[in-house]
Structures are given as structure tokens and as C-alpha cells.
């Protein structure tokens, strides 16, 4: 976490329960944590295109919701790091729980008939979200949120490992790439927290262009945003493969991964 001696800017005093290692208002008076803010674009723009593509392809609404949920997380995180206000912190952290619940639902419903609804699982996840929200609003303890979020991510990891081990082994590349990128982001998140003072001292001694590369919370956004996006692709690939849609991972402009569907063969 950041040392206490940070300047104020356009949004006034910090009211959030967390303040990250990036120096506040060091780039512009209007954005508290500039790099932590703009790094959220990876969680906003690509998932929006994914949602539009899912609508065009006539995919199940749960996957449209997955893309949109990731976009909401990115927008909430943008608002939080831009302002460092408690209300905006909630707009970041609570959607992280809700989006993961959507991901969990999708992963555990991959092998059901099309457009089926598991009301028991749906009720359980909604109840879990309500309990976490209620408790977190009362205790205001970030560690509680982090543990609850970690539980959901761990559930997704176990389910993904099951799928690539026992169901579709040829999806290991996509599944493990998603997991590896996410874990690398988690490593950077910890480095940013544990070595914050050392990182700040280092930035004072090097050119700004080098200092930018040590904004590890921004890297956390980039890597977990990409990892989450790839997880949606993995979940969607698994689901549509089960439904015999003939999915294929293609790279838009040779860079960005998307899922396209080959036409069904006519006999």
C-alpha cells in the first residue's frame, strides 16, 4: 500500500479504504492514480466488442453477461483509481464478486442443454453475492473482500483444471494461458503491495519512462483483465464445443484473440 504523504487533487481527500502504490496526482490534477486508471481500458473495450459479437452470433445470454460484467469491473476500477473515493471503491470491488459469480455459473453449466437454467446454482450464487455485499458494507475490511474473491477464483481454477484434464484436453493451451497470465498479474499485485516504498524510491532515481514500467498495480489490471477475457473465451469455447458450434480461436489483426464459428457442414 502507499505511504500516507500523497498530494490532493481535483477529487479532494482520499476516502477509500485502500490507496495503492502509484503516487497520487503525479501525472494530472484530474486523475488520482493515472496509470492505475488508464490500464483498465483492457477490461472495458475488448469485452464490449465480445458482448456485441456474442449478440450477433446468437449466443446464450450468460456469455453476453460475462463480457458486460468484465466491462463493468473495468469501469468501476477506472472510477475508483481516478477518484480514490469509497463509493467508487465499492463500484470496483463488488462487481468483481458479481462477475466471478457469473463466470462460475457459466463454467458449471457448460455441459447442459442449450438455454437451460440451473435455478439452484443461480440462487446459491445470488445469495452468496448478497451476503458478501451485506457483510462488506458493514465491516469495510478489504481483506474480507479479497478472501471472498479468491474463493471464487479458486473455484474457477479447479473447474477449469477438471475440464482440460478429463473433458477437453486439447483446450489446455487456452485454459492454462488464461490461468498463467492471471497468476502473473497476482504476483505483480503482491510486489506492488510489499515493496511499495522501495518502488517509489526507485522511481525517483530513474527516468519517468522507466518508472512507468514499475507501476505493478497497473500491470495487475492489464494481466488480470487479459486473463479474465481469455477465461471467458475458454468457457465459451467449452460451451459451444459441447453444443457442436465448431468454435475456433482467431486473432484479430493478428494480435487480439476472439472466438469465431465455422459454418456447420451440410451432409
UniProtKB/Swiss-Prot annotation:
Report how it sits in the membrane.
Multi-pass membrane protein
Q: In the UniProt annotation, what is the result of changing residue 99 to A?
A: No effect on enzyme activity
Q: In which pathway does it act?
A: Lipid metabolism; sphingolipid metabolism
| Alphabetical list of InterPro entries matching this protein | ACER
**What EC number(s) would the UniProt record show?**
3.5.1.-, 3.5.1.23
Similarity comment text for this entry: Belongs to the alkaline ceramidase family.
**The protein's name in its UniProt record:** Alkaline ceramidase 3
- Please tell me the species this chain comes from: Homo sapiens (Human)
Please name the taxonomic classification of the source: Eukaryota, Metazoa, Chordata, Craniata, Vertebrata
Amino acid at each position: 500500500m502507499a505511504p500516507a504523504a500523497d498530494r490532493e487533487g481535483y477529487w479532494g481527500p482520499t476516502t477509500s479504504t485502500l490507496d495503492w502504490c502509484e503516487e497520487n496526482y503525479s501525472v494530472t490534477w484530474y486523475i488520482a492514480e493515472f496509470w492505475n486508471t488508464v490500464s483498465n481500458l483492457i477490461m472495458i473495450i475488448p469485452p464490449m466488442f465480445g458482448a456485441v459479437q456474442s449478440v450477433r452470433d446468437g449466443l446464450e445470454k450468460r456469455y453476453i453477461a460475462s463480457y458486460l460484467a468484465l466491462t463493468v469491473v473495468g469501469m468501476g476500477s477506472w472510477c475508483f483509481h481516478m477518484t480514490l473515493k469509497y463509493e467508487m471503491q465499492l463500484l470496483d470491488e463488488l462487481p468483481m464478486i458479481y462477475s466471478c459469480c457469473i463466470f462460475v455459473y457459466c463454467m458449471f453449466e457448460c455441459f447442459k442443454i442449450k438455454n437451460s437454467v440451473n435455478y439452484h446454482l443461480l440462487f446459491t450464487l445470488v445469495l452468496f453475492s448478497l451476503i458478501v455485499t451485506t457483510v462488506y458494507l458493514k465491516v469495510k475490511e478489504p481483506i474480507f473482500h479479497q478472501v471472498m474473491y479468491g474463493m471464487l477464483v479458486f473455484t474457477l481454477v479447479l473447474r477449469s483444471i477438471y475440464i482440460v484434464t478429463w473433458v477437453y484436453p486439447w483446450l489446455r493451451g487456452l485454459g492454462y494461458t488464461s490461468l498463467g497470465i492471471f497468476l502473473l498479474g497476482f504476483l505483480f499485485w503482491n510486489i506492488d503491495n510489499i515493496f511499495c516504498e522501495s518502488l517509489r524510491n526507485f522511481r525517483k532515481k530513474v527516468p519517468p519512462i522507466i518508472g512507468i514500467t514499475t507501476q505493478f498495480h497497473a500491470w495487475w489490471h492489464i494481466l488480470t483483465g487479459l486473463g479474465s477475457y481469455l477465461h471467458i473465451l475458454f468457457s465459451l469455447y467449452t460451451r459451444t464445443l459441447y453444443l457442436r458450434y465448431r468454435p475456433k480461436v482467431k486473432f484479430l489483426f493478428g494480435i487480439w484473440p476472439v472466438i469465431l464459428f465455422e459454418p456447420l457442414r451440410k451432409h
